Design a protein with these regions (language model features):
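Short, Lys/Arg-enriched, disordered terminal segments
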Residues: 1-2, 271-273
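Short linear proline/tyrosine/threonine-rich motifs used for host-factor recruitment
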Residues: 257-261, 268-270
């Protein structure tokens, strides 16, 4: 088996310990680890060098959240050298609305925990790898965060990416909300050298730049195969809850504003700068 390519983006240094535990599970295989940060966190860097001595560490400009650093890494590697790719980052706690994703409560650290779940234990990591032995599975994560296209990103950004990458997307295609997964490396070739970090604005939430969120979806849409869940799929009750949730809860983002409606009544509005 070829080495596994791992990109780990560290914005919140206090959350590095969560990623480290996942990396220790992944490290049972040969890997090439690329670590990106926007500041030089000396204690974290020292720990990475001690634990993963071959890691390549770079300090990058703070653009495009975790997506622009991922693009940076994609543009500098030869994907033919890898069978699999793992993407990890320090997902912050969610302490304000919206706190529901895919019909599930993702408040506090729950979203991060769902995203890291595929490699959080040795058993979960093995299940994820086993799924990727199937020809039709090209990406694996946790079912709580495997989503379908929605109105949470301005469609003009998706339209531009569709033309630039010469791909098509639809409301039926799935993506991993929060972009942490293990996937077959070759599906990302379509992205190589088509985007660059300079295409992204500074990482300021609510700035009106939806390019990172459009790319989040594109990472799933470029996938010609299936996004599988290592922990199965929703039960009947969970599916009904999700359906009801979608009927009563609407979250829409445009280049001008963000709106949340419950039963058609606006409960949250925020204009973008």
């Amino acid at each position: 088996m070829k080495p596994i390519l791992v990109h780990m983006h560290i914005y919140y240094p206090h959350l590095y310990k969560d990623l480290k535990q996942c990396m220790l599970n992944i490290n049972t295989h040969e890997l090439d680890l690329y670590v990106t940060m926007v500041e030089e966190h000396s204690e974290v860097i020292s720990d990475i060098k001690a634990t993963f001595p071959d890691a390549k560490i770079e300090i990058l400009e703070n653009r495009g959240f975790d997506i622009a650093p991922f693009i940076h890494v994609l543009n500098k590697v030869n994907l033919d050298n890898y069978d699999l790719l793992v993407k990890l980052h320090t997902k912050r706690d969610i302490n304000t609305i919206p706190f529901l994703v895919n019909g599930f409560d993702v408040g506090g650290g729950k979203w991060r925990n769902y995203l890291l779940n595929f490699c959080k234990t040795e058993e979960n990591w093995k299940k994820s790898l086993d799924l990727l032995n199937s020809d039709d599975v090209t990406m694996v994560s946790d079912y709580h965060v495997i989503l379908k296209q929605d109105d949470n990103v301005d469609s003009k950004y998706l339209d531009k990416l569709e033309k630039k990458l010469k791909i098509s997307y639809s409301s039926e295609r799935e993506f991993v909300g929060g972009t942490m997964f293990v996937a077959k490396a070759n599906i990302f070739k379509v992205l190589q050298n088509k985007l660059k970090p300079e295409d992204f604005s500074s990482s300021i939430r609510g700035s009106g730049d939806d390019l990172p969120y459009a790319c989040e979806r594109i990472l799933g849409f470029i996938n010609s195969g299936k996004i599988a869940s290592f922990n199965g799929k929703k039960g009947v009750l969970e599916r009904y809850i999700t359906l009801i949730f979608k009927l009563i809860y609407k979250h829409k983002i445009t280049d001008k504003k963000e709106t949340i409606k419950i039963l058609g009544i606006p409960v949250y509005k925020k204009k973008k700068n």
